[in-house]
Curated annotation (Swiss-Prot):
Gene3D superfamilies xref list: HAD superfamily/HAD-like (3.40.50.1000)
Function, as annotated: Magnesium-dependent phosphatase which may act as a tyrosine phosphatase.
Chain sites annotated for binding substrate: W20, R70
Residue positions binding Mg(2+): D11, D13, D123
Protein's name in the database: Magnesium-dependent phosphatase 1
Cofactor: Mg(2+)
Catalytic activity as recorded in UniProt: O-phospho-L-tyrosyl-[protein] + H2O = L-tyrosyl-[protein] + phosphate
Species for this entry: Mus musculus (Mouse)
Record: residues binding phosphate: L12, D13, S69, R70, K100
UniProt-listed Pfam families: Acid_PPase
Phenotype upon changing S69A: Abolishes enzymatic activity
Effect of H103 to K/A: 50% decrease in enzymatic activity
């Protein structure tokens, strides 16, 4: 059987949704009567299309999920996770400005999962480099999170575990 990570960690901006929550949209957010999520100005807010399936797949595989975001819009990011009904997937959330290394040190401390047993999905190369130095398997996202990217990430993790 393919080895699975003990923790899958996701950035939020340009990984789960196609914007920066602290600059491109205007919190607070709400869910309209038609079920769409909107910002204060009424702008429609959406996830990348396959994000709910990605998180559901990890849940079905028994892989816990965490968030690691450097946004300064902490309340808005958490609000969006709840409005999109994604909060149920996340066992930990590290959402605050600063180095992603700090986010991962706290995730390690809170979960007990070794860095080598984590996989991390992020759109910013600097975060990939910094977190990769900890021994985390890092996957650089280019066009938002998708099932294909998840599959590639899990394969990369399994190969790293096998020493390939």
């Amino acid at each position: 059987m393919t080895r699975l990570p003990k923790l899958a960690v996701f950035d939020l901006d340009y990984t789960l949704w196609p914007f920066w929550v602290d600059t491109h949209v205007d919190p607070p957010f709400h869910k309209s009567s038609d079920g769409t999520v909107r910002d204060r100005r009424g702008q429609n807010i959406q996830l990348y299309p396959e994000v709910p399936e990605v998180l559901g797949r990890l849940q079905s595989l028994g892989v816990p999920v965490a968030a690691a975001s450097r946004t300064s819009e902490i309340q808005g990011a958490n609000q969006l996770l709840e409005l999109f009904d994604l909060g149920k997937y996340f066992i930990q959330r590290e959402i605050y400005p600063g180095s992603k290394v700090t986010h991962f040190e706290r995730l390690h401390h809170k979960t007990g999962v070794p860095f080598s047993q984590m996989v991390f999905f992020d759109d910013e190369n600097r975060n990939i480099i910094d977190v990769g130095r900890l021994g985390v398997t890092c996957i650089h996202i280019r066009d938002g999170m998708s099932l294909q990217t998840l599959t590639q990430g899990l394969e990369t993790f399994a190969k790293a575990q096998a020493g390939l």
